[in-house]
Amino acid sequence: MSRKGPSKKHQLLPDPIYGSTVVAQLINKILLDGKKSIAEDIVYSALDMVKEKTDQEPVAVLKRALDNIRPSLEVRSRRVGGATYQVPVEVKPGRANTLSLRWLTDFSRARREKTMAERLANEILDASNGLGASVKRREDTHKMAEANKAFAHYRW
């Protein structure tokens, strides 16, 4: 176990086109096999599609989508005696942001459109309108936390 204390958070540089750290995080989530240029192409073309379809600033639409996906509660397993309880806990802001980006990319990959850029653009548009699989995932997470509210006193 390290004696130096907790590791420092890596400060992410904003992306070169939009100047946004959120877009840079999304590029890193889309990244597969270290092919960052392909991930950048996917994200930038998806944001161009969002701009064409909505006539709004694509980063603002992306942030609105992430706000609609971002969970405030989740359940964590806690073993007490012989039983394992699903204990609802509040989600820290950093983890909430990570979960929203992860769900956005995962459910984009699961969509049926032809290219990944189309899938990502449509998932962003759906999420910004409060629709889509990623928003449903957040609602399911909140329902699970609500259903297990009785075990909230096991929180740590």
Curated annotation (Swiss-Prot):
Transmembrane spans: none
Record's GO cellular component terms: small ribosomal subunit
Superkingdom, natural source: Bacteria
Gene Ontology biological process terms from the UniProt entry: translation
UniProt cross-references to PROSITE patterns, sorted A to Z: RIBOSOMAL_S7 (PS00052)
GO MF: rRNA binding; structural constituent of ribosome; tRNA binding
Keywords: Ribonucleoprotein, Ribosomal protein, RNA-binding, rRNA-binding, tRNA-binding
Pfam families, alphabetized: Ribosomal_S7
Family membership: Belongs to the universal ribosomal protein uS7 family.
Assembly information from the UniProt record: Part of the 30S ribosomal subunit. Contacts proteins S9 and S11.
Described purpose of this protein according to its UniProt entry: One of the primary rRNA binding proteins, it binds directly to 16S rRNA where it nucleates assembly of the head domain of the 30S subunit. Is located at the subunit interface close to the decoding center, probably blocks exit of the E-site tRNA.
PANTHER family hit by this protein: RIBOSOMAL PROTEIN S7
Protein name according to UniProt: Small ribosomal subunit protein uS7
